UniProtKB/Swiss-Prot annotation:
GO terms for cellular component: plasma membrane. Residues 12-133, 150-274 form the EamA domain. This is Uncharacterized transporter AF_0266. It holds the Pfam family EamA. Belongs to the EamA transporter family.
Length: 276
């Protein structure tokens, strides 16, 4: 029972992250949101680094490079994308990450792609076409978030070799701290621009503590209790949370195009990640 509570909280934290970002980009720059988010999260991740297993010096450059993609590139482009598209659509596009992991693994790690997975990939990208309304802002926003999706896939694909040496929490904590180094120079101006808006401050704190720190801890706790291939299916609930939260909290419209396109994306991803 405990693992399902943890999963429900994790999915909720990650789903609401897109809503918090969409609210925050009304007042802060995309880089400011990312720098503030990780200033908070890294304070907690630093404790894990201090208490946990040390990353070997020879592995630090790879962890740093992975972190650049998984933190700086991923979050800045996601925040940029949400300037132009709704939080719900952003979460649907991000959910394509397993498909890019599959493609990158096939290219660089020589992992096999089955016929059913090819069908899933086609269905998922058809879904993206459906939700891509014919406007410059919408297409541009989706393209920006797609960069984040590819960055997340790079982080996951090329981080596989390090998971044989380090546990996921240790690796993630170091990648978060090292990967956000390019964001640190923007922190002083970001703090000044934050002001005294309690709703905005609450959104940033939520992103740093709950969506980032507790989100990852919860996910890895669940992975210890559940098979990874089955666990990944539950991540399909994240866009559902984001779409509903965006509609309820930010009055984002749930159009037929959005619902139909999202449904196709999630169906395609399910076909890709399900265990045969």
């Amino acid at each position: 029972m405990k693992k399902w509570i943890v999963l429900a909280l994790t999915v909720t934290f990650w789903g609401l992250a897109f809503t918090a970002i969409k609210y925050s980009v009304r007042f802060l720059s995309p880089i400011a949101i990312a720098s503030l988010r990780f200033a908070i999260a890294n304070t907690l991740f630093a404790v894990i680094i201090i208490l946990g297993k040390r990353i070997k010096w020879k592995d630090l450059p790879k962890v740093f490079a992975l972190g650049i993609f998984g933190v700086s590139v991923y979050h800045v482009f996601l925040n940029l994308g949400e300037v132009y598209i709704s939080s719900g659509v952003a979460s649907v596009v991000i959910s394509l990450a397993p498909i890019f992991v599959l493609i990158l693994s096939a290219i660089f790690l020589r992992e096999r792609i089955t016929y059913s997975k090819v069908v899933g990939i086609i269905i998922a990208f058809l879904g993206v076409v459906v939700i891509s309304e014919p406007s410059y802002a919408n297409i541009y926003g989706i393209a920006l978030v797609m960069v984040s999706t590819v960055a997340a896939a790079i982080y996951t694909t090329f981080g596989k070799s390090l998971l044989s040496k380090y546990n996921p929490i240790t690796l993630t904590s170091n990648a978060m701290v090292l990967g956000s180094i390019p964001l640190y120079p923007f922190l002083p101006d970001s703090i000044r621009s934050l002001g005294g808006d309690l709703n905005l401050i609450g959104s940033i704190v939520f992103l740093g503590i709950f969506s980032t720190f507790f989100g990852y801890l919860g996910w890895y706790y669940f992975l210890e209790k559940e098979e990874a291939s089955r666990a990944s299916v539950f991540l399909l609930a994240i866009p559902v949370v984001s779409l509903l939260a965006g509609n309820i909290l930010l009055a984002e419209p749930l159009t037929l195009r959005t619902v139909a396109g999202s449904g196709l994306v999630l169906l395609g991803i399910y076909i890709v990640v399900r265990k045969r």
